[in-house]
């Protein structure tokens, strides 16, 4: 059963806002925090833990997997220099130039992320277009595939470091690694319902220590073999790709692991602001990552030289952990475990936030979204999603069992999301920023070519694991597309079968029904059509309240709506008023609070003498709905399992009256 109430996730609740999304970040972040002095430093430090947690744990496995892929015909200095050079230039071209310089400018009132960019692109186009919609939904769907893989990949790679400790290398079997990783992940997912605000303050400092340790380890090994500094030249990356053919292309797929997590730079702009994130990357995170990759390369060179001197083959090592002195490996594993848990937390929080946005923008049905902090708006918990993520992460971990096996599944979803981001940024540049076509193409062509190259390289891993995020993304895309299409069909049918409010007023003037004391609020998605609940009340109860409010909730294309724009009241006649309540896609609807604003604007009523009328619709599949029968059934399943509108809109349950009707779709 599903409600006919104004559905924040129904397409007919079209995003509508007079606010023009800003083209550039200002001196505050999306939440109005001061970006000067101590405040700027605090935000930059906080971003180190949340924004860069994922990309900051890539050194655990990226260099190892890339060098293993390059060693198909054995390892020489050429392979080591080539892999390090490719890693460094991936960080420079993709993260620094593409994201920090260009993509982060495309913020939507301080917010970023694929759905925020979709809303901005739609605003720039001036209308909803199929292209932008498909791009946005595809990008969001692929993110969920990444969100399932990241925790398993990160935590496994950290726990596997125990095998590099001489005293533990024989006792730490694969089963032990899986057990420890499972306990860590179970603990992480179980604390989500209580929120992470209390421990979240430690994320930045812990990750700052992590990056500092990575820098120190890299510097220590670089000092022992400084020749690796030549890999900073792009010549070695180009030479490697030119000389290694298909192997070089395969290595590109592994090198891409160095930039997984890059989307977090835009997704978390609303929490930390553009400038603190950019400063943290340029002056701290990038130098630490670059130094660590150089250090791993230097350690690999030293190992190669030692092996060649002894007449032996180059061993396959866990380069990150084994470049540390043996006495420091256990503390390093513990620190890596903490860093990967923080990285996983950031991904989980990102999934919760994306889900909230998708619900508000009409891409998903209502879900139970709970706030876990009274003071921090970003602290939310989505129980159904948390359970699905946990089951998905554990299933993936026990299926692939090692980080090396999982590496084949990692990357394909991220490259897909990056292509979506590039295309929508191009639309914003052309339509909103008014860049000339040649100037916009200077951005689009090289970066889209780079994205497609990495996508093609990762596609070679499709059958060895790359199918997994694609399958998850395809499933989520189907769910979102079905929900949007089904909701639109339902809205169109309801509109065809409904009576315009103006016509109802004429009927009521001609035949006045019995009047009931108090106020009735009828929730609907279309303020111009008579709500189904109102028609049923007149038809079956044959009464009309003294005061009647037709209330609609709409979602804007901006993350937040000012209090001045929150409520719009239109008087129909002495008995009826229309109220439209506007929310941003980052906000949670709260009808009682909105009604308090209405009272300030002169709408008088007693909440204890007010009844909320909701229409409950029983959906029956039809062969002529415009969707295949399987899609009809999926839509009905989604509607039946949507969160109760009473809870979703925070309506006092004791004041709700529900009236049902059967509808075919």
Swiss-Prot record:
Keywords: Cell inner membrane, Cell membrane, Ion transport, Membrane, Potassium, Potassium transport, Symport, Transmembrane, Transmembrane helix, Transport. Pfam families: K_trans (PF02705), K_trans_C (PF22776). It is found in: Cell inner membrane. GO terms for cellular component: plasma membrane. InterPro entries: K+_transporter (IPR003855), K_trans_C (IPR053952), K_trans_N (IPR053951), Kup (IPR023051). Residues 1-18 have a biased composition (Low complexity). The chain crosses the membrane at residues 40-60, 83-103, 131-151, 171-191, 202-222, 245-265, 281-301, 332-352, 380-400, 409-429, 435-455, 462-482. Residues 1-31 are annotated as: Disordered. It is a multi-pass membrane protein. GO terms for molecular function: potassium ion transmembrane transporter activity; symporter activity. Its main location: membrane. It comes from the Bacteria. It catalyses: K(+)(in) + H(+)(in) = K(+)(out) + H(+)(out). HAMAP family: Kup. Transport of potassium into the cell. Likely operates as a K(+):H(+) symporter. Belongs to the HAK/KUP transporter (TC 2.A.72) family. This is Probable potassium transport system protein Kup. It comes from Caulobacter vibrioides (strain NA1000 / CB15N). The lineage of its organism: Bacteria, Pseudomonadati, Pseudomonadota, Alphaproteobacteria, Caulobacterales. The gene is kup.
């Amino acid at each position: 059963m599903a409600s006919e109430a104004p559905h924040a996730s129904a397409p007919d609740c079209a995003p509508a806002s007079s606010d023009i999304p800003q083209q550039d970040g200002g001196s505050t972040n999306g939440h109005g925090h001061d970006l000067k002095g101590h405040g700027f430093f605090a935000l930059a430090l906080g971003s180190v833990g949340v924004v860069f947690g994922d990309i900051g744990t890539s050194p655990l496995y990226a260099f190892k997997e890339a060098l293993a892929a390059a060693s198909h015909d054995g390892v020489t200095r050429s392979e080591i220099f080539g892999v390090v050079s490719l890693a460094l230039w991936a960080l420079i071209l993709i993260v620094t130039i593409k994201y920090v310089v260009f993509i982060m400018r495309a913020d939507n009132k301080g917010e970023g992320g694929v759905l925020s960019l979709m809303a901005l692109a739609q605003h720039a186009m001036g209308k909803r277009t199929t292209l932008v919609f498909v791009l946005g939904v595809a990008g969001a769907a692929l993110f969920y595939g990444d969100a399932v893989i990241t925790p398993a990949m990160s935590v496994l790679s950290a726990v596997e470091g125990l095998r590099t400790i001489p005293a533990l290398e024989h006792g730490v079997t694969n089963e032990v690694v899986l057990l420890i990783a499972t306990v860590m992940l179970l603990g992480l997912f179980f604390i989500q319902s209580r929120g992470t605000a209390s421990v979240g303050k430690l994320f930045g400092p812990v990750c700052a220590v992590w990056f500092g340790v990575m820098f120190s380890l890299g510097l220590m090994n670089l000092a022992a073999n400084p020749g690796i500094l030549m890999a900073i030249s792009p010549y070695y990356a180009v030479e490697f790709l030119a000389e290694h053919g298909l192997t070089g292309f395969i290595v590109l797929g592994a090198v891409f692991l160095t930039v997984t997590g890059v989307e977090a730079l835009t997704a978390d702009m609303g929490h930390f602001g553009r400038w603190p994130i950019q400063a943290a990357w340029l002056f701290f995170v990038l130098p630490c990552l670059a130094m660590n990759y150089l250090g791993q390369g230097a350690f690999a060179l030293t190992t190669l030289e030692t092996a060649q001197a002894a007449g032996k083959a180059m061993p396959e090592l866990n380069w990150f952990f084994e470049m540390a002195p043996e006495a420091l490996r256990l503390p390093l594993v513990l620190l890596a475990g903490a860093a990967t848990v923080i990285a996983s937390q950031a991904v989980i929080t990102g999934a919760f936030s994306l889900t909230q946005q998708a619900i508000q923008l009409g891409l998903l049905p209502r879900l139970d979204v709970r706030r876990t902090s009274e003071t921090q708006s970003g602290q939310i918990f989505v129980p159904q999603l948390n359970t699905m993520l946990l089951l998905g992460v554990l299933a993936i971990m026990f299926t692939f069992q090692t980080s090396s096996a999982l590496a084949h599944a990692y990357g394909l979803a991220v490259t897909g999301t990056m292509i979506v981001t590039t295309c929508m940024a191009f639309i914003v540049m052309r339509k909103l920023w008014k860049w000339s076509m040649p100037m916009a193409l200077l951005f689009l062509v090289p970066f889209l070519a780079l994205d497609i190259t990495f996508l093609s390289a990762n596609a070679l891993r499709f059958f060895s694991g790359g199918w997994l995020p694609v399958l998850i993304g395809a499933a989520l895309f189907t769910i979102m597309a079905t929900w949007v299409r089904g909701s639109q069909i339902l809205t169109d049918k309801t509109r065809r079968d409904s009576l315009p409010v103006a016509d109802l007023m004429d009927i009521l003037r001609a035949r006045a029904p019995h009047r009931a004391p108090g106020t009735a609020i009828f929730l609907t998605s279309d303020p111009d059509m008579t709500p189904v609940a109102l028609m049923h009340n007149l038809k079956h109860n044959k009464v009309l309240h003294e005061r009647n409010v037709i209330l609609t909730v709409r979602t804007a294309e901006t993350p937040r709506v000012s209090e001045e724009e929150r409520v719009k009241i239109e008087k129909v006649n002495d008995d009826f008023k229309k109220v439209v309540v506007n929310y941003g896609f980052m906000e949670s609807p709260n009808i009682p609070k909105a009604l308090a604003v209405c009272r300030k604007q002169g709408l008088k009523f007693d909440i204890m003498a007010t009844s909320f009328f909701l229409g409950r619709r029983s959906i029956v599949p039809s062969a002529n709905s415009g969707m295949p029968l399987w899609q009809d059934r999926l839509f009905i399943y989604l509607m039946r399992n949507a969160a109760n509108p009473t809870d979703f809109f925070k309506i006092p349950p004791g004041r709700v009256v529900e009236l049902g009707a059967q509808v075919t779709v």
